[in-house]
From Swiss-Prot:
Protein name: Small ribosomal subunit protein bS6
One GO CC term, this protein: cytosolic small ribosomal subunit
Family label: Belongs to the bacterial ribosomal protein bS6 family.
Biological process (GO), any one: translation
């Protein structure tokens, strides 16, 4: 069996069906004796260019180990499913199990966002306490 990285884009109007599609595709691979090494749902993202007047798509990435037969069946499913607007299958030398760069970048962004929000909240709380103390002193 060979290792593959599969990315497919789902039409944004069909985003709610992504879970079922992923389940169906993973079942197809596992029933043929294959393995899912990594599954990442990147969510809705802006496309670099419009595809059939669609500017956003739901991205899903799979790293799998499967037979050629299972891969051909998966590609047929992509081809005949109108919700899948693009797909890419890349053969890999070995299984990739770590997080993708896309997911790492997203986590870094969310961590930075949280750090930016925390100091503002701490400063506003400190500022409120000092103001209330000043007003208490003014009353005395």
């Amino acid at each position: 069996m060979r290792h593959y990285e599969i990315i497919f884009l789902v039409h944004p109007d069909q985003s709610e069906q992504v879970g079922g599609m992923v389940e169906r595709y993973t079942k197809l691979i596992e029933e043929d004796g294959g393995k899912i090494h990594r599954l990442e749902d990147w969510g809705r993202r802006q496309l670099a260019y419009a595809i059939n007047n669609v500017h956003k798509a739901h991205y899903v990435m799979l790293n799998v180990e499967c037979t050629g037969k299972a891969l051909a069946e998966l590609e047929d499913n992509f081809r005949y499913n109108d919700a899948v607007i693009r797909n890419l299958v890349i053969r890999r030398d070995e299984a990739v199990t770590g997080q993708s760069e896309m997911l790492k970048a997203e986590e870094n962004r969310s961590e930075r966002r949280e750090r930016r929000e925390r100091p503002e909240n701490a400063e506003s709380n400190d500022g409120d306490d000092s103001d209330s103390n000043d007003s208490d002193n003014a009353d005395e």
